[in-house]
């Protein structure tokens, strides 16, 4: 992407900063967010992931109000890939590490793209299997479940405001 001129290089760098901002936000939200957004709510063993995938292949997957076991692993992998990709991208931009860092950045970015596709496919399959719109649930916070599984009104959104503001301010400083 950056070989096509300076304008595309700036777009690439801005996209890298945006990915870094999203990763920082998700890590913070995974600690201070709502009940099902917290990392502690979706710690699953590899055995439970394979069991869930087996159930899914048999068209009888268990229903999860929060993240299902396969989706939870996808989130952890995407966060790690996002961190590695942005760190390697910053190193390439700062000309630290040489050609192997560029190669690593390329491999990481394509691996992350593949994982994003896998995750989106998982969301579609899970949405169809459970007859629910998971994308809408991610955006509005509403999902099918029992009343005791509901999230009470969260004060977390007020905690997250400074983080979002800092990320947006950083992007504005970079753009100007």
For the regions a protein language model found, what residue spans apply to each?
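Membrane-embedded alpha-helical bundles that constitute the cytochrome b-like, heme-associated redox core
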Residues: 1-176
């Amino acid at each position: 992407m950056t070989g096509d001129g300076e304008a595309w290089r700036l777009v690439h760098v801005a996209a890298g900063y945006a990915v870094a901002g999203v990763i920082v936000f998700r890590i913070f939200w995974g600690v201070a967010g709502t009940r099902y957004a917290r990392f502690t709510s979706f710690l699953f063993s590899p055995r439970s992931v394979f069991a869930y995938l087996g159930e899914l292949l048999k068209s009888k997957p268990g229903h999860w109000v929060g993240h299902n076991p396969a989706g939870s692993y996808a989130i952890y992998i995407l966060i790690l890939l996002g961190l590695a990709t942005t760190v390697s991208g910053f190193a390439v931009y700062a000309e630290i590490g040489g050609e192997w860092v560029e190669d690593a950045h390329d491999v990481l970015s394509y691996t992350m793209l593949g994982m994003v596709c896998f995750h989106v496919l998982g969301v579609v399959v899970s949405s169809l299997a459970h007859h629910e719109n998971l994308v809408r649930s991610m955006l509005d916070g509403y999902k099918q479940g029992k009343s005791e599984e509901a999230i009470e009104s969260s004060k977390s959104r007020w905690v997250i405001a400074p983080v979002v503001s800092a990320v947006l301010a950083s992007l504005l400083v970079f753009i100007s």
